[in-house]
Amino acid sequence: ILRGYASTLQKIYGPDDPLCAGLQGFMLINAAEIMRYTYQDNQYVKGWSEADTKSIEGMFRNVFLPVLTTFVQAKPYANGNWGGSVNKMVMAIGIFCNDEPLYNQAVDFFYNSRDNGSLPNYIAETGQLQESGRDQAHCMLGVGVLAELAECAWKKGDNLYAALDNRIMKGYEYLSK
């Protein structure tokens, strides 16, 4: 499936393309990570090869990243679950492609972006979420993508869970009330 997408997917388009690229892209990139490190090519089995990694990196850089970058560079216009989803995928591409500047861009967005998906804009000091007046489902999505992003960073040795006095935890506590 991943090889098929990497060889045919040329564009992600539509009014929700950043959200699609962030949410669905994250599932694909996680699957690619599993394939890359679990099913290695060997003399007995046609597993995941370096060529497969290069092909999928090309798809993430040339199809997904332009959509994500357009969103990141635009004036904020969406609820925070969009920005969080987009930024999580930017970070994941940075990790998968061993692109430290791209990873650092995602960390900077997490802390400093004007977008509603940055940590200080999505979760207030009280724990209230930017979408708390909307519905629980979108709040769960928004705080969930921030936690997934923090987990990706944790695997790299960066503790974003503790950011801004454990703001993600405060968001979960507020959400659970």
Where are these regions (language model features)?
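Aromatic-lined, polymer-binding surfaces characteristic
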Residues: 1-157
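CBM-like carbohydrate-recognition segments
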Residues: 160-177
